[in-house]
Amino acid sequence: MTIATPLKAQPKASHFIDGDYVEDNTGTPFESIFPATGEMIAKLHAATPAIVERAIASAKRAQKEWAAMSPMARGRILKRAADIMRERNDALSTLETLDTGKPIQETIVADPTSGADAFEFFGGIAPSALNGDYIPLGGDFAYTKRVPLGVCVGIGAWNYPQQIACWKAAPALVAGNAMVFKPSENTPLGALKIAEILIEAGLPKGLFNVIQGDRDTGPLLVNHPDVAKVSLTGSVPTGRKVAAAAAGHLKHVTMELGGKSPMIVFDDADIESAVGGAMLGNFYSSGQVCSNGTRVFVQKKAKARFLENLKRRTEAMILGDPLDYATHLGPLVSKAQQEKVLSYIEKGKAEGATLITGGGIPNNVAGEGAYVQPTVFADVTDDMTIAREEIFGPVMCVLDFDDEDEVLARANATEFGLAGGVFTADLARAHRVVDGLEAGTLWINTYNLCPVEIPFGGSKQSGFGRENSAAALEHYSELKTVYVSTGKVDAPY
């Protein structure tokens, strides 16, 4: 396979603050790499403490005037941003593919489009979703109102950089906050374009600032006294550190962390559909999706049919140039991630799992591309490393089970609780099983569909708080209660 050299994706500068690009060459330099070839497509600088201070000060200055605007006026700007994103979907999707290595056939339908949906949704509900309550108290009464928190920090992951930036910015902004957003150093480019588009849509300067950085930058943001809220998408270890730091200052937090989610296939399920769900829930974005159903529990009577169908369809997937619309599976985000995933595959083999297909680097790619074949293990047991730890790559574990009670107990025997799914023709059983699963986001007879109208988030070690839907506004605002007396104060002294 020969991959055409992509155009350079160098931004005007590393950071976007107060409505314009900003550079500080004293920051640590780092490269943005196209994962399909290993080629540098941009060179940027991590934020220095001075850049962090500048971004937060800019956000703080802009926030109060923004909060004083009506929700409808704020929402109008977000809806305009959604329109611009849709007009530029091709260019934004290509940039997302260069940034992440994900196939263009995915990014064109699932990345900037989802971000635009978030801006449109929150812009649309702004006039009504922030209303408070009227509480009659006899002659007196009280009312509540939702008020913004102030300056919020968003910290993104590298699997859906544009989507994550929008999922965090949309509820924060419509609630009257400002946001300083730090994308992953692996995928630094998309958020800068989102910032440009918001300014073009009419967002006042300073309300959405983007700064670059790595694990050393996060603490500067999280520990800043002017930051009221932190929203992180990332791994469980990172989430623990960020939550602990935020707790020291009693900051509001939303944690959207990792998972090892169960997908349960009963023997009465439509096997073709269940296999499709398992493939989407393990191989989409080369398996780099936090909610993936990487523990696929298949009832024993259906196991042979399931594996035969799965093997045939997996081996028909097209791996290759992510800029080619025919490609199903692109590279992982980096060589480091490739090495991590390959090491888990070796652990699966060593611990006795049966390798059904995949398990290595595909023959049709060479050089510096971070590719891994879509991999299926069968005969996996609950104690195997590949069944317990989040791999974040195209590795599916298929486990057997006999009955409903058994599979529920095993599915819940994990520290994670992000997601789960069930495939069955018996809808009564489907509802019973999802009620029993200890997870925040669940699907019946499908998997990994996340429209912005529904809340998304986890439980247990997979995080807390919710993104998307009107529920997200509760995490970017707080209630103010006002008691109104209609009479004189009756004091006993």
Curated annotation (Swiss-Prot):
Keyword annotations from UniProtKB, A to Z: Metal-binding, NAD, NADP, Oxidation, Oxidoreductase, Potassium
Binding site for NAD(+): G156, A157, W158, K182, P183, S184, E185, S235, V236, P237, T238, G258, C290, E390
Modified residues (Cysteine sulfenic acid (-SOH)): C290
Cofactor: binding comment: Binds 2 potassium ions per subunit.
A Pfam family assignment: Aldedh
Cell membrane recorded as keyword: no
Pathway terms, separated by semicolons: Amine and polyamine biosynthesis; betaine biosynthesis via choline pathway; betaine from betaine aldehyde: step 1/1
GO terms classed as biological process: glycine betaine biosynthetic process from choline
Binding of K(+) 2, residues: L250, K460, G463
Enzyme class, broadest EC rank: oxidoreductase
Entries under PROSITE patterns matching the protein: ALDEHYDE_DEHYDR_CYS (PS00070), ALDEHYDE_DEHYDR_GLU (PS00687)
Catalytic residue positions: K168, E256, C290, E467
Function according to Swiss-Prot or TrEMBL: Involved in the biosynthesis of the osmoprotectant glycine betaine. Catalyzes the irreversible oxidation of betaine aldehyde to the corresponding acid.
Family note: Belongs to the aldehyde dehydrogenase family.
Assembly notes: Dimer of dimers.
Stated name of the protein: Betaine aldehyde dehydrogenase
